[in-house]
C-alpha cells in the first residue's frame, strides 16, 4: 500500500506538531485532525489543500527582488513544512533549482553565519571528537539512509567557507528529494567542523564555527575515521556522499573508504558520470563515438582527473586500449600541459600525463605548454573546463578549435556562473552555432542567426539522485565504478538531441523524475549483477524504485494515545 494513503500514527499533539517540519501541515490539517491533535485556534479557520498553500507560497516567493532572499525564504518553508517545500519546488523546479542550489547556494554559504536562522542537520566539531556517536544520536532523523557530508574546505569555486559549507549538504539533499524522490525523513546533512583557514571567517565576530586553523595530517585522518565508523555502527546501510572536500583530501578519503562502506564522492565521481553521459549524448548527436574523440581539459584537480578517468574507462569499453585512450586525453593546469617528466604531479595526475616523447614534434614547444598550444597541436574535438577560473576559453582558443572540428563539443563546467570558462553565448557566436555546449550552471537560451539554442546544464543533479535511488531500491552495499558507468549511459539514453536530433543535449528538469528512475534502474541492475545486493528480477527492482519514490503529499494522521 502507498505510504501516502496510510494514516500516520502520532504520539504527540498541539504546538509540537506545528514545530515538526516533517509532519507539519499548517492550514491543511483537517477538521478532525485539528480536534484530535489540539490544534484548534493554533492555525487559521480555513482548511486549505496543499496546492492552495503552494500557490500562496509561490506568490510570496515571487515578491522577493533578489535570489539570496528567495533562497532564505525557501529554506524557511523547508524548516517549517517540508512537504509544502517539496511540492512548491516540484511545481516550479526549473525556476527554483538555481535558487536552492547553484548558483545561489554559493552566496548562501558565504553568508551562512550572518543569515543563520534555524538549525538543520548536524555539526560535528573537532573538539567534540570523542562524542561523535552521542552527536549522531541527537539527530531528529533516526532512519537515515543518505548522508551528504562536507568539511567546508572547497565550496564550489569559493574556497574555504568553514561551517558555511553546510549550505551544500542541505542543498544536495534537497535535490535528492525533489529530483530523486528520496523521502526527506531519510536524509541527513552533516558538516565536519575541523576549523578554517579563511582569515575573514576567523576574524568575523559572527562566525559560528570552531574558530581555529584547520587540522590536518594524522589528526584529520583519525577524525574522519572516527566519523565513518560511528556512522556505520549507527546506520550500517546508509549511503554517504562526500561533498566539496579539498583536492588534497578528496581522493585519499574516497580511496580509503569506497570498498569499506557504501559511499562516493560527487565532485569526483558524480561530476564524471554526468559529464560522460553528456559526452555520450553529444557524440551520438554529432554522429560519432567517444573513443574517436581527442579531449582537452582545463583544470587537472581531483574533479577534472576523475572525469578524465571515467572517459578513459568508457573509451576502453568501446574497444580501444587503455594506453590509446590516455593518449587522446590532454590535461592542462596552471603550469600547462601535464607531462610525465614533471616532478610534482599528484598520484591521480600521473597516469594522465602525456609522454614527452609523444609531443616532441609539436609546434611552439616550451616548458609550459598552454591550452592554445594543445588546441593547435593535438586538435581536440572536446574541450572541458573545470578550472574555476573565468574567461579562459578565449575567442582565439574556441575559433582555433572550430577551425579543425566542424562540431566542437565544449563544456565550461566551473561553478558558480561567475567562474565559467566562457559563456554559451560567446561560444556559439564564435562557432556560428555549431558547438555542442553544456555548462555547470544554468544559462538562458542563446539566439544565433535567428536560431535558438537551449543550453544543457551538465549538472550533477541529473545523476546523483538517480544513483541514490538505485542504491536504496537495490540495497547495494557499495557504489562500484560499473554502477557509475551505467548511470552515464542511462543519462545519455534520455538526451532529446541524441534521440530526436533536436532539442537540448540533456533532458529538461521537468522530466527529472523519469530520468532519475531510469538511472536508478540501470544502477540497481548492475549492483544486482555484481552481487552487491540481493538477487531480484527486473520487475521487482522497478517496483522497489516506485516504492522508494516519495511524493510531496500530506498523509492522514491518527493519535496513538490521549
UniProtKB/Swiss-Prot annotation:
Binding site residues for NAD(+): 154, 267, 415
Cofactor dependency: Mg(2+); Mn(2+)
CDD domains: NAD_bind_1_malic_enz (cd05312)
Residues forming the catalytic site: 101 (proton donor), 172 (proton acceptor)
Cofactor note: Divalent metal cations. Prefers magnesium or manganese.
Catalysed reaction, written as an equation: (S)-malate + NAD(+) = pyruvate + CO2 + NADH; oxaloacetate + H(+) = pyruvate + CO2
SUPFAM superfamilies, per the entry: Aminoacid dehydrogenase-like, N-terminal domain (SSF53223), NAD(P)-binding Rossmann-fold domains (SSF51735)
Signal peptide positions on this chain: none
Enzyme class: oxidoreductase
Record keywords, A-Z: Metal-binding, NAD, Oxidoreductase
GO terms for biological process, alphabetical: malate metabolic process
GO cellular component: cytosol
InterPro entries: Aminoacid_DH-like_N_sf (IPR046346), Malic_enzyme_CS (IPR015884), Malic_N_dom (IPR012301), Malic_N_dom_sf (IPR037062), Malic_NAD-bd (IPR012302), Malic_OxRdtase (IPR001891), NAD(P)-bd_dom_sf (IPR036291), NAD_malic_enz_proteobac (IPR023667)
Site label Important for activity, positions: 267
GO MF assignments: malate dehydrogenase (decarboxylating) (NAD+) activity; metal ion binding; NAD binding; oxaloacetate decarboxylase activity
Keyword presence, NAD: yes
UniProt similarity note: Belongs to the malic enzymes family.
Subunit structure: Homotetramer.
PANTHER family: MALIC ENZYME-RELATED (PTHR23406), NAD-DEPENDENT MALIC ENZYME, MITOCHONDRIAL (PTHR23406:SF34)
Name assigned to this protein: NAD-dependent malic enzyme
Lineage: Bacteria, Pseudomonadati, Pseudomonadota, Gammaproteobacteria, Alteromonadales
Gene label: maeA
Amino acid at each position: 500500500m502507498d505510504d501516502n494513503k496510510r494514516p500516520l500514527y502520532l504520539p504527540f499533539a498541539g504546538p509540537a506538531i506545528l514545530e515538526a517540519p516533517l509532519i507539519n501541515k499548517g492550514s491543511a490539517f483537517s477538521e478532525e485532525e485539528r480536534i484530535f491533535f489540539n490544534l484548534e485556534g493554533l492555525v487559521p479557520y480555513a482548511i486549505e489543500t496543499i496546492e492552495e498553500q503552494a500557490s500562496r507560497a509561490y506568490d510570496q516567493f515571487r515578491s522577493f527582488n533578489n535570489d539570496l532572499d528567495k533562497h532564505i525564504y525557501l529554506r524557511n518553508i523547508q524548516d517549517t513544512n517540508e512537504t509544502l517545500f517539496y511540492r512548491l519546488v516540484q511545481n516550479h523546479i526549473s525556476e527554483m533549482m538555481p535558487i536552492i542550489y547553484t548558483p545561489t547556494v554559493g552566496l548562501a554559504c558565504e553568508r551562512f553565519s550572518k543569515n543563520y536562522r534555524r538549525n538543520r542537520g548536524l555539526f560535528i566539531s573537532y573538539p567534540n571528537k570523542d562524542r561523535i556517536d552521542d552527536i549522531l544520536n541527537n539527530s531528529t532523523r533516526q532512519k537515515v539512509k543518505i548522508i551528504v557530508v562536507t568539511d567546508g574546505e572547497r565550496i564550489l569555486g569559493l574556497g574555504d567557507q568553514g561551517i558555511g559549507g553546510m549550505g551544500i549538504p542541505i542543498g544536495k539533499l534537497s535535490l535528492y528529494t525533489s529530483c530523486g524522490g528520496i523521502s526527506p525523513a531519510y536524509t541527513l546533512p552533516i558538516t565536519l567542523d575541523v576549523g578554517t583557514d579563511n582569515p575573514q571567517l576567523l576574524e568575523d565576530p559572527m562566525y559560528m564555527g570552531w574558530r581555529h586553523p584547520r587540522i590536518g595530517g594524522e589528526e584529520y585522518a583519525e577524525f574522519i575515521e572516527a566519523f565513518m565508523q560511528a556512522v556505520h555502527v549507527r546506520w550500517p546501510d546508509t549511503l554517504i556522499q562526500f561533498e566539496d572536500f579539498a583536492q588534497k583530501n578528496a581522493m585519499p578519503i574516497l580511496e580509503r573508504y569506497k570498498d569499506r562502506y557504501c559511499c562516493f564522492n560527487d565532485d569526483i565521481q558524480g561530476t564524471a558520470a554526468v559529464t560522460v553521459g553528456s559526452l555520450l549524448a553529444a557524440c551520438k548527436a554529432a554522429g560519432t563515438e567517444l573513443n574517436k574523440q581527442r579531449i582537452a581539459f582545463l583544470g587537472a584537480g581531483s574533479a577534472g582527473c576523475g572525469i578524465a578517468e571515467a572517459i578513459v574507462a568508457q573509451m576502453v569499453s568501446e574497444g580501444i586500449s587503455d594506453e590509446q585512450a590516455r593518449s587522446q586525453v590532454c590535461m592542462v593546469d596552471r603550469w600547462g600541459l601535464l607531462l610525465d617528466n614533471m616532478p610534482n604531479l599528484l598520484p591521480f595526475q600521473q597516469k594522465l600525463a602525456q609522454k614527452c616523447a609523444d609531443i616532441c614534434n609539436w609546434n611552439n614547444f616550451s616548458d609550459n605548454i598552454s591550452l592554445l598550444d594543445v588546441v593547435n597541436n593535438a586538435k581536440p574535438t572536446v574541450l572541458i573546463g573545470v578550472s574555476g577560473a573565468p574567461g579562459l576559453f578565449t575567442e582565439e582558443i574556441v575559433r582555433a578549435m572550430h577551425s579543425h572540428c566542424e562540431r566542437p563539443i565544449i563544456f565550461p563546467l566551473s561553478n558558480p556562473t561567475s567562474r565559467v570558462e566562457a559563456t554559451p553565448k560567446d561560444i556559439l557566436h564564435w562557432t556560428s552555432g555549431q558547438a555542442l555546449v553544456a555548462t555547470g550552471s544554468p544559462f538562458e537560451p542563446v539566439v544565433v542567426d535567428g536560431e535558438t539554442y537551449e543550453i544543457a546544464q551538465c549538472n550533477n543533479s541529473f545523476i546523483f539522485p538517480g544513483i541514490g535511488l538505485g542504491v536504496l531500491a537495490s540495497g547495494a552495499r557499495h557504489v562500484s565504478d560499473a554502477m557509475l558507468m551505467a548511470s552515464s549511459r542511462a543519462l545519455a539514453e534520455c538526451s532529446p538531441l541524441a534521440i530526436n536530433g533536436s532539442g537540448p543535449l540533456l533532458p529538461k528538469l521537468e522530466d527529472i523524475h523519469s530520468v532519475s528512475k531510469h538511472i536508478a534502474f540501470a544502477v540497481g541492475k548492475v549492483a544486482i549483477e555484481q552481487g552487491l545486493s540481493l538477487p531480484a528480477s527486473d520487475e521487482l527492482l522497478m517496483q522497489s524504485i516506485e516504492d522508494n519514490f516519495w511524493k510531496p503529499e500530506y498523509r492522514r494522521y491518527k493519535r496513538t494515545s490521549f
